Amino acid sequence: MAKHLFTSESVSEGHPDKIADQISDAVLDAILEQDPKARVACETYVKTGMVMVGGEITTSAWVDIEELTRETVREIGYVHSDMGFDANSCAVLNTIGKQSPDINQGVDKADPKEQGAGDQGIMFGYACNETEVLMPAPITYAHRLMERQAKVRKDGTLPWLRPDAKSQVTFQYEQGKIVGIDAVVLSTQHCDSISTPDLREAVMEEIIKPVLPSEWLNKETKYFINPTGRFVIGGPMGDCGLTGRKIIVDTYGGAARHGGGAFSGKDPSKVDRSAAYAARYVAKNIVAAGMADRCEIQLSYAIGVADPTSIMVETFGTEKVSHDIIIEAVRQFFDLRPYGLQEMLNLLQPIYKKTAAYGHFGREEFPWEATDKAALLREFAGIK
């Protein structure tokens, strides 16, 4: 594969599925603030004029679900009926129940260190040295375009923008290295008064150019800005939204495998979330240590069992030390039991709402992005 193209997409915080993710994680954070040992599995559905919050929650905390939901939608920017969705007037339905005692008996143990996994499943983590945050470039820059869209919308630079938007970036590779950007797609909701030519010029100048490195852009790069020409009806009025429906956007943009489990609304006892974060942490430290240029970790668990049922390390032929050394380092320096990874990454804190838009990985504010084990791994592997 001497030459190839690779594409990843992102969506804005105002995309219906991301509204749902943010509400679910806002509920999780509010509960963890009061009760760090709570069991939370919160799902959200949004559609024109309505939000439904459901799931299974066992906690001593009390949270005003309706007000929390409205505040989350308000922060995103849906504050007027002209946008098709209004935080102040939408209906909020609460259908939350309690976690099954059959699950509790497998997770909760007398010795917290032996806490079992909340479910069976497979989780993947990935890192590569393609960007400074050790993430694939296509998803990294797709997210940054969406972050920029939100910034210029909220600070008044482009006041006619609305919250719903999507981006997609296609990178050109030769011999596995980036040589340019082949195509950029950006669709953004807007008010009715802006013309398509004015919108396209403003998006190019205020969103695309400030984000994408000029050395990767050339006269052959193709731009598709609101290619249908009109995007006034958006958000929950245009499409219904559901928690957990943007799992590739949330992770590696398709550049790595995915176990299928979503993240938002789940407390750290759910290994769908916590073990995926731990797998990213392991992979990132391996790459940061110089043990490999690319690394993918797979973990698997059985419900009620503490130790992973399997650990897989894949370095795609880019390893700089023996594969056996890398595997031994993972086993020796990373505690991948549910309790161990919660402690290792300090996961029992209200940090999850911020993860629910613009990706869970490649953002240094999150503990699973630390490379604090890299020096230890280098020493173990004898890397100078």
Swiss-Prot record:
EC number from the UniProt entry: 2.5.1.6
Protein name (database record): S-adenosylmethionine synthase
Subunit structure, interactors included: Homotetramer; dimer of dimers.
List of residues binding Mg(2+): D17
Cofactor note: Binds 2 divalent ions per subunit. Binds 1 potassium ion per subunit.
Position of the signal peptide: none
Record has Nucleotide-binding as a keyword: yes
UniProt pathway: Amino-acid biosynthesis; S-adenosyl-L-methionine biosynthesis; S-adenosyl-L-methionine from L-methionine: step 1/1
Residues holding L-methionine: E56, Q99, D239, K270
Gene Ontology biological process terms, A to Z: one-carbon metabolic process; S-adenosylmethionine biosynthetic process
UniProt GO cellular component terms: cytoplasm
Domain of life: Bacteria
Residues that hold K(+) according to the record: E43
Record's keyword terms, sorted: ATP-binding, Cytoplasm, Magnesium, Metal-binding, Nucleotide-binding, One-carbon metabolism, Potassium, Transferase
Pfam families attached to this UniProt entry: S-AdoMet_synt_C, S-AdoMet_synt_M, S-AdoMet_synt_N
Assigned protein family: Belongs to the AdoMet synthase family.
GO molecular function terms listed in the Swiss-Prot or TrEMBL record: ATP binding; magnesium ion binding; methionine adenosyltransferase activity
Location relative to the cell: Cytoplasm
Primary gene name: metK
Organism, scientific name: Vibrio vulnificus (strain YJ016)
Known cofactor(s): Mg(2+); K(+)
Catalysed reaction equations from the record: L-methionine + ATP + H2O = S-adenosyl-L-methionine + phosphate + diphosphate
Role this protein plays: Catalyzes the formation of S-adenosylmethionine (AdoMet) from methionine and ATP. The overall synthetic reaction is composed of two sequential steps, AdoMet formation and the subsequent tripolyphosphate hydrolysis which occurs prior to release of AdoMet from the enzyme.
